From Swiss-Prot:
Belongs to the importin beta family. Importin beta-1 subfamily. PROSITE patterns: HEAT_REPEAT (PS50077), IMPORTIN_B_NT (PS50166). This is Importin subunit beta. HEAT repeats lie at residues 8-37, 39-71, 91-129, 135-166, 176-208, 218-253, 259-308, 320-366, 370-400, 408-444, 455-491, 505-542, 549-597, 605-645, 650-687, 692-730, 738-782, 792-835, 837-878. GO terms for molecular function: nuclear import signal receptor activity; nuclear localization sequence binding; small GTPase binding. Keywords: Cytoplasm, Protein transport, Repeat, Transport. It is found in: Cytoplasm. It holds the Pfam family IBN_N.
Length: 884
């Protein structure tokens, strides 16, 4: 790079912090053009500016930032593209950039180090493929060498921290000891620089997943714990907080090793942190004990599972939370009294953290928590100080989830009159907390909420509170959801039929009217009130008994009228905020429409279906219909209507088909695409061969979706399931697509699970279940409904060996879900009825026999039934083989 070009680039970089918008835009455009014209040379030039200490701090920082932004992205796909691009650079340019950014470490006078970030992001690309082998040792040397400057130690530790944060697990395994040596060296209390200690402590936090082998060795673990505990006592609050964060993470990762340190170090350190007036310190102290509780809740579940299976648990709880309970609860309830009147709902505070900690403590310690919190609640629930009233109510609401019903019910019933009275408290914060507590009561101990002694009084205060401040009204809406669920559960019988009446029937119409009014409040956007009110409305409708049906019908018409009114408002939208609210409202109305339609009686559906489809088609046709959220909810509303109308939906297909295809093609918004695919299956099942005229276009789009490389993987299982629905519905009309679909199913069925990739395994299992559903639909569709299988099913015979091998592979890999087992068993039964004795040699296999035997022992009724049926069908064809 010539000096003139370098000077020009430096000048441009310095303009990236200019207050002048024109200069900023000009600089942005120049840098984008430079990157587009020759990216390797551009990044090399940036690295040369970064390494040159004669350049201004602004230019160097901007160069580092530009360099970093061309190496990584928050979007995983883009980040992968950047990594692939880096590998294609000429090796001499890659090496020069690496040398420059490494040489720049410790030479900056700004924090954090841009060079450290650049080094880390190149390392994340290169270390997994064994390039830049000396990097880690070089960074370690910069930290531990006696002559190393403060800036060198700090920036090297920052680089190590960034690498540990982003590198793929396992890559650093052979160098974890060296990394840990450097980190612990930088954390020691003899280190004179707090900047270095902070960078080291942050790096430790990022590297803890890699230190498993070190924590397994007593001496190494003792040394690590000593250094971390020392760091928690540092006068620099940032170091103290970072060290506490390490303890929080250590407790989660290495719980089983913590017993030697708990009484003497961890307990006193974290209790003192909880009591701190520094919010950041207090939050970490509280977080530590929340994590302890989470861990011990999981261990209790594991222990119960082990007992049920007649084996010893792999890990056991040390019951630290129970042991600390009497010391923790006074600190936590005291933190609850420190809430700020102007607290932003999104700001995490010690008071909010204390509430969460009390919840998990109650879950962990159950009834043992009661004597430690009840005196505080009784003493303060009617305190003249609103903070103490609120803390008492918050404590009460927070511990409900862990208590046994026998303990909980009398406590709640005794508290009900006071709680109802507090719904009219002068403090909005107290009323908000009370409304939240009632929501929890309705959810956790519903029988207390619908107790006729208090029900009418409770409903009166709920309805009045719907007119309160948005935050209070929103919590009341969530309480209505719990109340609605409680009333329904109390009334519904074992057969699952809709009950004739329930506890809320006398008040139902009034509640619905008030909720509809709440959805229309001008301040409905605050505290998510409008959404909460519509959710409550949907839940009330969903859980309505037969004697409330007239109100449901009227509500359907109200929602339909609102949908039409809202669409007429579209011309009045002036800005992005209005558009966002408009789309949200349409999506809520579509969701509510689904809820009311599910309760509409089948014979009443044709009377309203024209009006509903007209409204939905108008919406699809409007610009709002292009919004992903609106499209998704609208497709789900159509799906509910299809379920109601059955084959009568056919008259809407000519007008609706193009919008359905538009949704199927919208794979960029995968939720919309999934909703459209699900709806496609629903329509085919309802209309059967009436869908044949549309099959070609729809199948073409679905097949294209499966071959589209950028489509979100969530869509693929849905498409495969849809193939099954389509094949089942149109029978031999599916034959033109059979070969291509079977090829796709074969490719999908060959995907292998990976023991180290939980997410991928979850996806593969979902895919496999969809494959089984597709095969089942195809077999049933081609077989026909007659007792004797139609000859069309013989098109599947060449594929039977692969299909049975696929089922055997599922069986051999183990850990099969009940739903997968049921799908496989049902499919095996269908194969038997379709192919008879000729199938027996493929099914006469110990793997299949064992697989179905396991299913017969399942606790899930459907799985048990289908596996039993499949075994009978196999025996039947075996008998036929013997008698032939």
């Amino acid at each position: 790079m010539t000096s003139d070009i370098a000077m020009q680039l430096i000048a441009i970089l310095e303009k990236t912090v200019s207050p002048d918008k024109n200069e900023l835009l000009s600089a942005k455009n120049f840098l984008e053009q430079a990157a587009a014209s020759n990216l390797p040379e551009f990044l090399k030039a940036l690295s040369e500016i970064l390494v040159n200490t004669a350049n201004s701090a602004v230019a160097r920082m901007a160069a580092g930032l530009q360099l970093k932004n061309h190496l990584t992205s928050k979007d995983e796909k883009v980040s992968q593209q950047y990594q692939d691009r880096w590998h294609q650079f000429p090796s001499e340019i890659r090496e020069l950039i690496k040398n420059n950014i490494l040489a720049a470490l410790g030479t900056e006078n700004t924090r954090p180090s841009c060079a450290a970030q650049c080094v880390a992001y190149v390392a994340v690309i290169e270390l997994p493929i064994n390039r830049w082998p000396m990097l880690i040792q070089t960074l370690v040397n910069k930290v531990v060498s006696e002559g190393s400057s403060e800036m060198h130690r700090e920036s090297a530790l920052e680089a190590i921290g960034y690498i540990c944060q982003d590198i793929r697990f396992g890559v650093m395994e052979n160098q974890s000891n060296d990394v840990l040596t450097a980190i612990i060296h930088g954390m020691r209390k003899v280190e004179p620089s707090n900047h270095v200690r902070l960078a080291a402590t942050t790096a430790l936090h990022n590297s803890l997943e890699f230190t498993k082998s070190n924590f397994e060795k007593d001496m190494e673990r003792n040394f690590i714990m000593e250094v971390v505990c020392e760091a928690t006592q540092c006068q620099d609050s940032q170091i103290c907080v970072a060290a506490l964060q390490c303890l929080v993470k250590i407790m989660t990762l290495y719980y089983q090793y913590m017993e030697p340190y708990m009484a003497q170090a961890l307990f006193p350190i974290t209790l003192a942190a909880m009591k701190s007036d520094n919010d950041a310190v207090a939050l970490q102290g509280i977080e530590f004990w929340s994590n302890v509780c989470d861990e011990e809740i999981d261990l209790a579940i594991e222990s119960q599972e082990a007992t049920d299976q007649g084996r010893a648990p792999q890990r056991v709880s040390k019951h630290y939370a129970r042991g600390a309970l009497q010391f923790l609860t006074p600190v936590l309830v005291e933190k609850l009294t420190k809430q700020d009147e102007c607290d932003d709902e999104d700001t995490w505070s010690p008071a909010k953290a204390a509430s969460v900690c009390l919840m998990v403590l109650a879950t962990c310690c159950e009834d043992e928590i009661v004597p430690h919190v009840l005196p505080f609640i009784k003493e303060n629930i009617e305190s003249p100080n609103w903070r103490f009233r609120d803390a008492a109510v918050m404590t009460f609401g927070s511990v409900l989830n862990g208590l046994e019903t026998n303990t909980l019910k009398p406590l709640v019933e005794q508290a009900m009159p006071t709680l109802i009275r507090l719904m009219y408290d002068s403090s909005v914060i107290v009323r908000d907390t009370i409304a939240w507590t009632f929501g929890r009561i309705c959810d956790i101990i519903p029988e207390a909420a619908i107790n006729e002694t208090y029900l009418q009084t409770l409903l009166e205060c709920f309805v009045k509170s719907l007119k309160s401040e948005p935050r209070v009204a929103a919590n009341v809406c969530w309480a209505f959801i719990g109340l609605s669920d409680a009333a329904w559960e109390a009334a519904v019988t074992n057969d699952g039929e809709t009950p004739e009446t329930y506890a809320l029937s006398p008040y139902f119409e009034y509640i619905i009217t008030q909720l509809l009014e709440t959805t229309d409040r001008s301040d409905g956007a605050q505290a998510n009130l409008r959404c909460a009110a519509y959710q409550a409305l949907m839940d009330m409708i969903k859980n309505s008994p037969l004697d409330c049906y007239l109100v449901v019908q009227r509500t359907t018409l109200v929602i339909l009228e609102r949908l039409n009114q809202v669409m007429q408002m579209e011309t009045q939208i002036n800005n992005h905020s209005d558009r966002h609210q408009f789309n949200d409202l349409q999506s809520l109305l579509c969701a509510t429409l689904q809820s009311v339609l599910r309760k509409v009686h089948e014979q009443d559906a044709p009377q309203i279906s024209d009006a509903i489809m007209t409204a939905l088609l108008t919406m699809f046709n409007s610009s709002a219909g292009k919004s992903g959220v609106v499209q998704e909810e609208a497709f789900l509303a159509v799906s509910t209507l299809v379920e109601l109308l059955g084959a009568q939906f056919a008259k809407y297909m000519p007008a609706f088909k193009d919008f359905l295809v538009m949704g199927l093609k919208n794979f960029q918004e995968y939720q919309v695409c999934c909703a459209a695919v699900g709806l496609t299956g629903d329509i085919f099942r309802a209309l059967k061969d009436l869908m044949v005229p549309y099959s070609n276009e729809i199948m073409t789009v679905l097949i294209n979706n499966l071959t589209e490389p950028t489509i979100h993987r969530t869509v693929k299982p849905q498409v495969l399931s849809a193939f099954g629905d389509i094949a089942l519905s149109i029978g031999n009309h599916f034959l033109p697509y059979l070969s291509m679909v079977l090829d796709m199913l074969r490719v999908a069925s060959n995907l292998q699970t990976d023991a180290n990739n939980f997410d991928m395994n979850e996806y593969i299992n979902e895919l496999r279940e969809s494959i089984l559903e597709a095969y089942t639909g195809i077999i049933q569709g081609l077989k026909g409904v007659d007792q004797t299988a139609h000859t069309d099913v013989m098109h599947m015979e060449p594929h039977l060996m692969h299909i049975i091998s696929f089922i055997k592979r599922i069986a051999q890999e183990g850990d099969v879900s009940d739903s997968m087992l049921a799908s496989a068993a049902g499919f095996i039964g269908d194969l038997c009825t379709s192919f008879g004795p000729r199938l027996y040699p493929l099914l006469d296999d110990a793997i299949i026999t064992q697989f179905l035997a396991e299913g017969k022992r399942s606790k899930a009724q459907r799985t048990k039934m289908l596996c039993t049926w499949a075994v009978k069908e196999i025996k039947k064809i075996n008998t036929q083989v013997i008698t032939q």
